[in-house]
Amino acid sequence: WIDPANRMACIQAGAVGRNIVTQLAVYGFTMGHEPDSVEFSTLGGWIATHASGMKKNRYGNIEDIVLDFNLVGADGTLSRRDINPRESIGADPRRFVFGSEGNFGIITQAIVKLFPLPEVQRYGSVLFPDFRSGVAFMYDLQHEGIPPASVRLVDNIQFKFSMALKPAKSGLAAQKSRI
């Protein structure tokens, strides 16, 4: 289910990231959690591995986005909780599940925060004369007070490696790129 008024959604743990992104966009929302593996990984996997996404600067990590979840324990018992406000006493056992890799049970679904889709998305690249200048830029950007949702600094070796991993174009796409 999706609750637009309270900006929450209940999503099955096996839902693949790319499908979550597409379905929430229909309603004008995003979870904001997009790890590098978003095309193939699942919500339950993100919780079990304590995943961090490319847009964590704006939306937070998975533990900041998940409000609650259902868990099937080793004895087959389904743990289901109501969404409650933060409690100020003792440890929060729900936090132990993040990064537990399934040791405390299997996550079956989660209730997550939703955010409105951004009005504008811009992508670009900046070249620096050396890596140190790039690090200085990243430092200044972080201290401006309004960090971008996603920013990444890569050196030339990493860039060349990632380009080498891209599949070669074929057919019409290959012909078009030669023009």
Write out the residue ranges for each language-model feature.
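FAD-binding subdomain of flavoenzyme oxidoreductases
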Residues: 1-152
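Terminal amphipathic helices with adjacent charged low-complexity linkers/tails
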Residues: 149-179
